[in-house]
UniProtKB/Swiss-Prot annotation:
Matches recorded under PANTHER family: 40S RIBOSOMAL PROTEIN S15A (PTHR11758)
A Gene Ontology cellular-component term: ribonucleoprotein complex
GO biological process: translation
Record keywords: Ribonucleoprotein, Ribosomal protein, RNA-binding, rRNA-binding
Classification via Pfam families: Ribosomal_S8
Coiled coil, from the record: none
Disulfide-linked positions: none
Function according to Swiss-Prot or TrEMBL: One of the primary rRNA binding proteins, it binds directly to 16S rRNA central domain where it helps coordinate assembly of the platform of the 30S subunit.
Protein name in UniProt: Small ribosomal subunit protein uS8
Subunit structure: Part of the 30S ribosomal subunit. Contacts proteins S5 and S12.
Family: Belongs to the universal ribosomal protein uS8 family.
MF term (GO), any: rRNA binding
Top-level taxon: Bacteria
Amino acid sequence: MTMTDPVADMLTRLRNANSAYHDTVSMPSSKLKTRVAEILKAEGYIQDWREEEAEVGKKLTIDLKFGPQRERAIAGLRRISKPGLRVYAKSTNLPHVLGGLGIAILSTSSGLLTNQQAAKKAGVGGEVLAYVW
């Protein structure tokens, strides 16, 4: 069975594992999911990620990050642009998540970028995939 929205599936798996205080979460891998994991690691929301060979295809395993008292590094994840309703942002109107405390993940012509990275590159807007805070 094909998956309609792999990014939403990834975010749901992360959200569920995070709320259950799991140390790792696994899912089918793709280039888009790998790039989202790279962004989450660079922004400090996850500890690490790795791709492993599975019986069919590849598997993406993400190590979640917790504080010294088991506080979650990810407070929330929200899918914005969905298959039924795409959401786009111009370079002049990029979203701000929680007044700059969170990030928006954008799919641009320059690849996947955060809203801060897209703001630094003049004239880059794109599809708003998700908010992370």
